[in-house]
């Protein structure tokens, strides 16, 4: 059986493990996009360290959880967003103003909606975390 959306599977796995109180979680299969999303979550203090373990196949990410995630999910479909429209999407996916992050794939890489707004660039919404 194949995964239809590995990013959504990884984020729901992280959310479920946080709710049960686990300290670490293993995410497979690994991909560049999942790695970039984990990097953004690490920079914003939602997870601890993470590392890529080579299993001879697609790889596995081992993620340390610190108990700061209430909910994380993938945004489907991947909506295109202009720089001036982030507030509308923030109201739609986040529970309160300045609480949580939207993760955006831009031409300059994967970043939060706040960083993209500072740079004045748009992109595609791929996930939210709060």
From Swiss-Prot:
GO molecular function, one term: structural constituent of ribosome
Alphabetized Gene3D superfamilies for the sequence: 3.30.1370.30, 3.30.1490.10
Keywords assigned by UniProt, alphabetized: Ribonucleoprotein, Ribosomal protein, RNA-binding, rRNA-binding
GO aspect biological process, one term: translation
Membrane-spanning intervals of the chain: none
Gene Ontology cellular-component terms listed: cytosolic small ribosomal subunit
InterPro entries in the cross-refs: Ribosomal_uS8, Ribosomal_uS8_CS, Ribosomal_uS8_sf
Keyword Cytoplasm: no
Keyword Ribonucleoprotein included in the entry's annotation: yes
Pfam family, one: Ribosomal_S8
HAMAP family in alphabetical order: Ribosomal_uS8_A (MF_01302_A)
NCBIfam families: PRK04034.1
Function: One of the primary rRNA binding proteins, it binds directly to 16S rRNA central domain where it helps coordinate assembly of the platform of the 30S subunit.
Family that this chain belongs to: Belongs to the universal ribosomal protein uS8 family.
Subunit composition and interactions: Part of the 30S ribosomal subunit.
Name of the protein: Small ribosomal subunit protein uS8
